[in-house]
């Protein structure tokens, strides 16, 4: 969405095209049935016995959770690939999501001590080696060199970061990233997955729901 005008950056037809793809994935058994996979939603696929047993071919994951997914089935060989894109796509489908931000507030009682910690956290070789790839690939070349040297730089995460760095991407706007919008989208996809609605009807309903929500903001 355009954060200033609240206008959609896509059409109802675009939504239907996406939902047609979702339906085809379920219809052709590319995805596990929605009735089964719903138990492992909310980034919990690593707990799915089928994933652990190596019965799935691939999955989507945040760069920061790739090592969580691979740790759930250490006997498999993993690779990192590109996001699928529709023909004629105007965007490459990648969005930057940075949920953790460290800052020293104006009400901090010991700002100097807090800044010393941040200096250690971001600039100390020891801290960079300790944190390693716990929360994704380190953002600085120095930290990556340290992690590569001590063997803590996950190669799959590094490959994913290199792929993402070549994308133009988008930043999350305040409307599409809002919990209400996310729930509307998730409910729509789930309804198509369960077969309780068709892509065209679902697209129309989703467009109306999002329009109603955003116009009220």
What are these model-derived regions, one by one?
Residues 45-49, 65-73, 211:
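Pocket-flanking alpha-helical
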Residues 5-39, 83:
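Glycine-centered hinge/linker elements that transmit conformational signals in sensory
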Residues 60-66, 84, 100:
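Beta->alpha turn/N-cap motifs
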Residues 47, 52-61, 76:
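Alpha-to-beta junction loops
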Residues 1-5, 19-20, 27, 90-105, ...:
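Periplasmic solute-binding protein
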Residues 81, 131-191:
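Long, aromatic- and glycine/proline-rich binding clefts that accommodate carbohydrate-like moieties
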Residues 35-52:
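Short helix-initiation/N-cap motifs at beta->coil->alpha
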Residues 31, 71-137, 187:
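Extracytoplasmic/periplasmic substrate-recognition and gating elements
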């Amino acid at each position: 969405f355009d954060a200033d005008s609240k206008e959609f950056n896509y059409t109802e037809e675009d939504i239907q095209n996406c939902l047609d793809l979702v339906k085809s994935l379920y219809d052709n058994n590319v995805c596990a049935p929605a009735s089964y996979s719903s138990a492992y939603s909310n980034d919990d696929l690593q707990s799915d016995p089928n994933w652990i047993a190596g019965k799935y071919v691939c999955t989507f994951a945040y760069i920061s959770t790739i090592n969580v997914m691979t740790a759930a089935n250490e006997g498999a060989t993993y690779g990192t690939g590109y996001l699928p894109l529709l023909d004629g796509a105007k965007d490459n489908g990648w969005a930057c999501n940075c949920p953790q931000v460290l800052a020293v507030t104006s009400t901090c009682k010991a700002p100097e001590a807090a800044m010393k910690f941040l200096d250690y956290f971001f600039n100390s070789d020891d801290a960079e080696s300790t944190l390693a790839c716990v929360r994704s690939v380190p953002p600085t070349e120095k930290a990556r060199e340290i992690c590569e040297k001590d063997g803590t730089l996950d190669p799959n995460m590094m490959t994913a970061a290199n792929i993402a760095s070549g994308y133009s991407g988008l930043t999350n706007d305040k409307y599409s990233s809002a919990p209400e919008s996310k729930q509307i989208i998730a409910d729509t996809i789930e309804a198509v997955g369960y077969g309780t609605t068709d892509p065209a009807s679902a697209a129309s309903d989703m467009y109306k729901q999002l329009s109603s929500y955003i116009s009220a903001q």
